[in-house]
């Protein structure tokens, strides 16, 4: 499947039309950003590892009952996906406190939460992706009650499935964000990506950070850490 026209360009991914009106090509670039785009850098090889990492995770979730937009990997940096009508919402689950919630609530980094904590955020870089709740979503027409409940249900299921996958590879899934959209058949599918760019993964013994916090905090070895996570999961990352 060939790319025809770029229709969306984000901070680290682009979407292209194809000969099929229901399918898009998702391209993963080496571009890396943090703090709503205020810190930027190109990290050689990150796009390839993220594309193939995402495919591995999406395939694993599909096998465990989570419908996703992923169809197939086309090459090292491109994947074919279903075209969706996206919700302008990020769904976040936290198993431990880290990042923005520590700043917001003054909690210690790494605090183990009694239960997984679910949060909604509005997807808007200019506003800093503000925290929102169900009432905001319904009042502004971003999703209805049934869609909200389905997104919550699927996000919790993603957490259950992936926590087990990662802990079996000596990794702690600290938190993650996911996005959803509606396909042409009307089903809500997991969309966008699941990579170390959008989750926190710590070594279960040393608590070493293996995710994009290495970029945010200037720890270095970002792509190398992504490869280490992929290796632990048994992936064979190919670079064209």
Residue ranges and their predicted role:
Residues 1-4, 238-240:
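Basic/polar N-terminal segments that are highly enriched at the extreme N-terminus
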């Amino acid at each position: 499947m060939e790319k025809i026209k770029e229709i969306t360009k984000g901070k680290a991914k682009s979407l292209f039309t194809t000969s099929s009106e229901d399918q898009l090509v998702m391209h993963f670039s080496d571009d890396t950003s943090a703090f709503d785009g205020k810190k930027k850098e190109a990290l050689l090889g990150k796009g390839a590892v993220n594309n193939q990492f995402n495919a591995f995770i999406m395939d694993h979730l599909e096998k465990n009952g989570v419908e996703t937009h992923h169809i197939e990997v086309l090459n090292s940096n491109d994947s074919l996906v279903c075209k969706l009508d996206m919700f302008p919402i990020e769904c976040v689950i936290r198993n431990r406190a880290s990042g923005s919630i520590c700043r917001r609530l003054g909690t210690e980094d790494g605090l183990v939460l009694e239960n997984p904590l679910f949060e909604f955020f509005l997807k808007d870089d200019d506003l800093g992706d503000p925290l929102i709740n169900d009432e905001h979503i319904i009042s502004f027409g971003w999703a209805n009650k049934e869609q909200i409940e389905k997104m919550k249900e699927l996000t919790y299921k993603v957490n259950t499935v992936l926590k087990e996958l990662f802990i079996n590879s000596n990794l702690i899934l600290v938190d993650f964000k996911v996005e959803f959209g509606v396909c042409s058949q009307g089903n809500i599918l997991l969309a966008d990506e699941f990579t170390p760019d959008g989750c926190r993964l710590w070594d279960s013994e040393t608590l070493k950070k293996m995710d994009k916090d290495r970029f945010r905090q200037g720890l270095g070895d970002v792509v190398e850490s992504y490869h280490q996570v992929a290796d632990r999961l048994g992936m064979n990352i190919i670079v064209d």
